[in-house]
Curated annotation (Swiss-Prot):
Classification via PANTHER family: ARSENATE REDUCTASE
Entry similarity comment: Belongs to the low molecular weight phosphotyrosine protein phosphatase family.
Domain of life where this protein originates: Bacteria
Coiled coil spans: none
Protein known as: Glutaredoxin arsenate reductase
Keyword Iron-sulfur included in the entry's annotation: no
Function: Reduces arsenate [As(V)] to arsenite [As(III)] using glutathione and glutaredoxin as sources of reducing equivalents. GrxA is the most effective electron donor in vivo compared to other glutaredoxins. Constitutes the major arsenate reductase compared to ArsI1 and ArsI2. Also shows weak phosphatase activity toward p-nitrophenyl phosphate.
CDD domains per record: LMWP_ArsC (cd16345)
Length: 131
């Protein structure tokens, strides 16, 4: 079973939604974690957006990348274009992708929904590719 790490700047919105989708859609196929270059909180609007599609991410936590070891993961996905800021060991794993999705923080609910849809589609494609 492949181990996947989703990373974004604050581990608040995009990476949290990706973790929620991956845990739900990839249950039994992949192991999933998320982190940020810095930690903050799981954004309340991200929680609400995922509730709209029947996924509860309210129990997820926002954790800094320093809490994890890159060698524990086969797949590393940056969601925010922050790949250039990751320590080198994170971008040299078996699979590294930088999805460069828009940050919905502070934007309309429609932007959140659009980003949520983009995250879901990419997570589905990732699961199909690695499982």
């Amino acid at each position: 079973m492949k181990k996947v790490m989703f990373v974004c700047k604050r581990n608040s919105c995009r990476s949290q939604m990706a973790e929620g989708f991956a845990k739900t859609l990839g249950a039994g196929k992949i192991a999933v974690t998320s982190c940020g270059l810095e930690s903050s909180r799981v954004h309340p609007t991200a929680i609400a957006m995922m509730e709209e599609v029947g996924i509860d991410i309210s129990g997820q936590t926002s954790d800094p990348i320093e809490n994890f070891n890159a060698d524990d993961y086969d797949v590393v996905i940056s969601l925010c274009g922050c790949g250039v800021n990751l320590p080198p060991e994170w971008v040299t794993q078996e699979i590294f992708e930088d999805w460069q999705l828009e940050d919905p923080d502070g934007q309309s609910l429609e932007v959140f929904r659009t980003v949520r849809g983009q995250v879901k589609e990419r997570v589905e494609n990732l699961i199909a590719k690695i499982s």
